[in-house]
Amino acid sequence: EIPLRLVGSEMCIRDSYNDNRKTLSYPVVRSFIKLELARVISEKFENVDAIAGVATGAIAQGALVADLLGLPFVYIRSTPKDHGLENLIEGELKPGSKVVIIEDLVSTGGSSLKAVQAVRNFGCDVAGMVAIFTYGFPVAEAAFKDAKVTLTTLSNYDAVLEEAVRTHYIDESEIAVLQEWRKDPANWDPK
């Protein structure tokens, strides 16, 4: 889904939620994503000790990838549980482990980098983050750079726009508006 809806001749851009969890319902798509995430991790990162998924959207794919790679899996909550052990990281993770974090979608990077910080605070090395999709918002790119985290994604906003043009969901004339929205979606004004 892209953040565009045509209403008559007026173009309306709204906040969009790219729900990658729906891909879990389609075995061929689910398997493709699992294989591609595993391929990226195998090619980009050496001597990985564990895979961590960001709750909740990346738990399932993270577990599938960890299983395929034969690695331990943990997941990272956005906030500690308020009962029981009150864990932020669920599963067995040893301090000093080299961890690749899997995320489903990166928008501003806030929740993703909070997960990175949780793993670092636990005493582990974050090798990098691999995600299914990113909007490529400038604020996220700057945040990942500041946090010194390598982010690799399977797809991105530009690829979605290219596919939307190719399949005639939008036409070339609408690309500039959609790219302008991406620069600062919170303050975007369609004028």
Enumerate the language-model features and the residues they cover.
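Glycine-rich phosphate-binding "P-loop"
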Residues: 16-31, 107
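Conserved acidic residues
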Residues: 49, 97, 127
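A short, well-structured juxtamembrane/interface segment
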Residues: 29-48
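Short, glycine/charge-rich flexible loops or terminal/linker lids adjacent to PRPP-binding catalytic cores
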Residues: 62-100, 108-114
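Single conserved hydrophobic/aromatic residue that forms the stacking wall/gate
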Residues: 1-8, 12-13
